[in-house]
Design a protein with these regions (language model features):
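N-terminal pre-P-loop "Q-motif" helix
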Residues: 4-17
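Walker A/P-loop nucleotide-binding motif
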Residues: 23-41
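Conserved NTP-binding/hydrolysis module of P-loop NTPases
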Residues: 50-53, 59-77
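Conserved alpha-helical scaffold flanking the Walker A/P-loop in AAA+ ATPase domains
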Residues: 78-93
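Helix-loop-helix "sensor" segment of P-loop NTPases
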Residues: 132-184, 198-211
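Conserved C-terminal helix/linker of AAA+ ATPases
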Residues: 202-228
């Protein structure tokens, strides 16, 4: 079930990212799994003209993505010439910012490419951790990056998300009564909150009974582990 939930919160972080974009600074967008790094970048992609690379450990996929976004044909160039042409195009492009989404462990080859890009245009790295054993080859570069950290939702942000989902009739109005439970169960994690709201939208759970809430949480876990299974009652 694909649920279109409203994007709420993160106003402070969005304002900071817009400021850093204007200043042409490198950015390390840091946050644990589910904090909404990709969703935040997607909100800014079109307004700021971001060039977002896919989450990949393969340099070829990232290079192909950048070539496509810059309107470059692959042609018959060998890999070295393609790389040099791409870097030259990035340097000559106006107001380009390259985002490497989900930049986890980077190999020496990929890390070297990211460094080459960062010498020509501002780079944003979306990572779950800034520890060297998690990010790999790019770790020495991070001293040049401004840190923007996404933390768990405050209860008021959870309330805003639930209220927005109710207004858009994504979930029933009764959901407002369990906002505190939702925030506690998700520990403020936006991804888990959205998964719980998705389960509520299926309409299979009695939100007024503790047993119904336990089943709601169980179904969320089941859909997380086995996303292809419907688990419909």
């Amino acid at each position: 079930m694909n649920l279109s939930l409203p994007f709420v919160g993160r106003e402070k972080e969005m304002s900071r990212l817009r400021q850093l974009h204007q200043q042409r600074r490198h950015v390390l967008l840091l946050g644990a799994e589910g904090m909404g790094k990709s969703a935040l970048v997607e909100q800014l992609r079109e307004p700021l003209g971001l060039h977002v690379c896919p989450a990949s450990e393969h340099l070829s996929e990232i290079r192909n993505s950048l070539e496509h976004s810059l309107g470059l044909e692959a042609g018959d160039f060998d890999l070295v010439k393609r790389k040099n042409r791409l870097l030259k195009s990035l340097k000559e492009a106006k107001r380009v910012v390259v985002v490497f989404d989900n930049a986890s462990w980077t190999t020496p080859k990929l890390g070297s490419f990211i460094e080459s890009v960062s010498l020509r245009v501002p780079v944003w790295l979306c990572v779950r951790s800034e520890h060297p054993w998690d990010v790999g080859r790019i770790w020495p570069l991070l001293v040049r990056f401004e840190h923007v950290e996404l933390k768990p939702f405050h209860p008021k942000e959870t309330q805003k998300l639930v209220a927005s989902a109710v207004v858009k009739k994504v979930v029933p109005e009764k959901t407002l009564e369990i906002t505190g439970w939702l925030h506690h169960r998700a520990a403020g994690n936006p991804k888990i909150l959205c998964e719980l709201l998705t389960e509520i939208a299926r309409g299979h759970h009695d939100l007024s009974r503790p047993h119904g809430l336990r089943l709601l949480d169980l179904d969320r876990h089941l859909h997380e582990m086995f996303p292809a299974m419907p688990f419909d009652k």
